Design a protein with these regions (language model features):
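ATP-dependent adenylation/nucleotidyltransferase module used to activate substrates
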Residues: 1-159
Length: 159
């Protein structure tokens, strides 16, 4: 008997790439996933929520929807998910004619996506209380749908 406990989790953005991975897992084209987790910013287009409902209707691997709150509300309040500093979204500054346009600093992916999914894995999948260590012999593989043109966004495996 193996002492290794494995979990296979799909970070589901409900876009083309993560949807393809979800469907491939449903049909056995890739390793089966135990859960798909959608981090809801509360500001996704209606078509994303409709698509998410369609995916759920396929009765494939369970899809968890988790949220850190509504990004737009935090932006209007000038606060982030912890109630401190600013809510940083990806946006661009408007420039006068001929001037260079810049992008503001952004952190929403970390606060509204990455941390939400990591918390769901730790609490909902592994059943861990906050600040508890993952038990020895437990391995979590996360699947991300990233296309070739987005490869610079991909990061290496971390222990």
């Amino acid at each position: 008997m193996s002492s290794l406990t494995e979990y296979h989790i799909l970070n589901l953005g409900a876009g083309v790439q993560s949807t393809a991975l979800y469907l491939m897992a449903c049909t056995g084209e890739i390793h089966a996933i135990d859960h798909a987790i959608f981090a809801d910013t509360g500001e996704e287009p209606g078509a994303v929520y409709k698509h998410l409902e369609w995916l759920k209707s396929l009765n494939g691997p369970p899809i968890m929807v988790r949220s850190a709150g509504k990004l737009g509300d935090d932006l209007r309040r000038g606060r982030n998910t912890t109630g401190g500093r600013f809510a940083a979204i990806p946006c661009f500054t408007q420039a006068e004619a001929g001037a260079e346009v810049g992008r503001t600093r952004r952190q929403c992916s970390k606060e509204y996506k990455t941390e939400v999914i990591e918390r769901a894995i730790r609490r909902d999948v592994l059943g861990l209380d906050p600040r508890k260590r993952i038990p020895k012999g437990t391995h979590v593989s996360q699947y991300f749908g990233i296309s070739w043109d987005e490869r610079s966004r991909a990061s290496r495996t971390r222990p």
